Amino acid sequence: METASRRDHFPNQQLSQTIAQRFAQKSFTPLELYCFNCVFRSLADTESGVHYWSETTLCRFLELPDALGVGSVIFQMASYLGAFPLPSQAPAILTYEALLKVVTILTERYGAVVKKRGREIWLREIYRSLAIYDKGIRSSLEDKEKEKEKDVPAPVSSGNMGFAVDAPDDGDEGDEDEDDELVLAALDSMDAIDAFKHGEQSNVHHSIIPTDNFLKLVELLLLIAPIDAQQSLSTLAPDLSDTRVAELRRAAHVIISSFGVENHPGVTYRTFNAVISTCLPYLFNGLNPLFEHFLFAKDMDLSKRKGGPNSPTKESKPVIPPPKAQSEPILREPGEILNLTILSQLSFFLKGSDLFRRLRPLYSGNTHGFSMGSFEKQVFNWRAPTILLVKGRLLPTTPSTTRERALQDMLPPKRHPSSITPDSLSSNQTLIYGAYISSQWKHTGKTCFGDASTTLFQLSPTHDVFTASAFSHDYTYFSKSPTTPAGLGLGTPIPTQSASHSSHSHSHSHPVFRPGPVSLHLDDALEFAVFTHLAEGGGSFLPSKLPARKGSDWQDRFEIESLEVWGCGGDEVAEEQRRTWAWEEREAEARRRVNLGTGDQEMDRELLKMAGVISGDRSGGSMG
């Protein structure tokens, strides 16, 4: 009886209106609510006395490009979120209250009302808004996953504590009660939990996101990643050419492949949560500023509003200043690897505030030359984080050139397949690996440099991220011959003197190079690269957390086509680098201008000392 009375006391419509009122009171300022009201009423359609937004109106207001075909996906998300906290009422008509809830959730302003584990539960709501519920499809999908798990050999266990740190998390279906924590917390404040628990829970584990819908959404997210709350989508991408659309689609396919959709009809919640949490934590960030547009009432046509005694006059309408002109473009100049689309892909796991309008091109192999010396000259003076990108094609199994044979001789016999599987050889064969290096580059002595924020990643043909491990700190190295390993890379320890001597004794011409369990190595000619991934881990970087790659070992040996380094930082870092380069140039010019040629070494040395080029101990000057 008590439950029944509570359900009668909180009918569905009242529950929906009450939560909308709570969001309005606690999540927005009065000015923001006024702007939202102006936006809604100026564009709303009316039928049977109900004001609402249609799919066409929503897509036109957000300026969603027709070329991406994503309007129906966004409208589906909005229709589901508009029914919050009652999923059985979805799809909801986008009335004032429903659309206010959509904006609250997608701009992540619900925290003032719902404080418990907000981000994690928010991700569940995003999944639900994209998913379809079909137990038949879901059961078939689970059977396929179980069959695949039988075929994948279990990773070899080890007593080494380092491997325990690296062991990929199997994930958890989670308690059913946790699925609705956001909803329960919201209703708890209204004493309506019992009403909700009787028939209002939806099980995310009986659903999937259709691949095509997810692909279209990811294309949009790639496009809007750099958008500002006061920037319209039409100004961000005024000319969405066929070339750009194809570029967005290719990148979206790469990202979608990380969800293992090649062998499945869609994305399950377990896979969605695992991939987003580990490899794409900022994927949905662009939705926040996009839906913030509802809170800026600039240039709105209020002619459709009916005047009334309490209606604000035109003069009382708040004046929202136009967005400030950006002093910097999103990306000053594209590289051979890095363009706007790849930059957006990077922003899905590196903070966009460190990337957009903050990157400077430091080094390009095809511009500055593929040599360690050129790399050092262009990169070492950048005293801020850098992003290294390398692109190439797989080497043939049998070496065809002297250099390829030398690489093969340097490495142990190849025991693992490449990451490009035989059934995908006809599609994307381009390999792109990279790294985020937080420390300034330097010559490697006895130990590597870098810290736990150093990150390895793959951008093609699959999106994957390999974060730093606590087991080992061999993050980054830059070593010239005869130091081994000669070249640059991440994740391989510098051998001790005794180990290096032992390696030389086994091979007089080519010491064997043994890459770390998860590592990237570029040879000292910057001609070839090797990426190694062992699922057992145990090195400086954690193995892949992608469910589709669970237990997988691979090694990609490829010829480098393009190599780039980009500096993260503002004008102040670039100015410091310019000052350092200018100082080095002055030092070199001073050496050239000293008139030597007396034939007397002591006199020549005294002249250099007088010029301040060298000190009394015969060494060159320093920056002090």
From Swiss-Prot:
GO CC entries: cytoplasm; nucleus
Pfam families: TLD
The keyword Transmembrane helix belongs to this UniProt entry's keyword annotation: no
Bias type Basic and acidic residues, positions: 143-152
Tree of life domain: Eukaryota
InterPro entries: TLDc_dom
Main location: cytoplasm
GO biological process: response to oxidative stress
Domain (TLDc): residue spans on this chain: 336-569
Entry's localization field: Cytoplasm
Role this protein plays: May be involved in a process influencing telomere capping.
Family, similarity comment: Belongs to the RTC5 family.
Designated name of the protein: Restriction of telomere capping protein 5
UniProt organism field: Pyrenophora tritici-repentis (strain Pt-1C-BFP) (Wheat tan spot fungus)
